[in-house]
């Protein structure tokens, strides 16, 4: 899979490349692309099937967390998930375990309104006192990734609404 190859090459270079620097894991302004993955991401100027190091727009992407493999693994099949993405960063990157939901709290699916943005759908967590206690710890972190669709492509709007990726 192209997304996994991108991340594998990126990490391999950080650990064993000509200038290894693990600090760049989260802020490197480059990745590894071939023509197919560059087209997928909308990055011009990459030709051929071989992966190579490619500079990225630092206003859009930096490091492993903005790569498609991570974005796809922390989303649902057809939509982003601020909850999954925020939980992933809090628990796997910041090593901050989050409490499980109380057993008597039902899972509340987001609003089915097809015209609202993902953020608008998930902001119900903030308004519901039974949900807000835990979701305030992860949803804002996940909102920071809303410029990435469910498979990691950059976007500036969703359903005609500008993306609000503020935390």
Regions found by a protein language model. Give the residues of each.
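Amphipathic alpha-helical substructures
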Residues: 1-54, 108-122
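Sequence context surrounding c-type heme c attachment/ligation sites in exported
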Residues: 38, 52-167
């Amino acid at each position: 899979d192209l997304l996994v190859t991108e991340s594998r090459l990126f990490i391999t270079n950080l650990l064993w490349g000509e200038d290894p620097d693990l600090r760049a894991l989260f802020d490197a302004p480059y990745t590894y692309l071939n023509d197919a993955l560059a087209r997928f991401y909308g990055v011009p100027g990459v030709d051929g099937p071989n992966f190579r190091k490619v500079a990225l727009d630092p206003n859009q992407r930096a490091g492993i967390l903005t790569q498609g493999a991570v974005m796809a693994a922390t989303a649902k099949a057809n939509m982003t998930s601020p909850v999954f993405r925020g939980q992933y960063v809090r628990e796997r990157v910041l090593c901050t375990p989050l409490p499980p939901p109380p057993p008597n709290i039902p899972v509340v699916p987001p609003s089915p309104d097809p015209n609202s943005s993902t953020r608008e759908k998930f902001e119900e967590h903030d308004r519901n006192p039974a949900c807000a206690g835990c979701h305030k710890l992860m949803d804002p972190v996940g909102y920071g990734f809303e410029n990435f669709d469910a498979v990691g492509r950059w976007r500036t709007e969703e359903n005609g609404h500008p993306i609000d990726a503020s935390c």
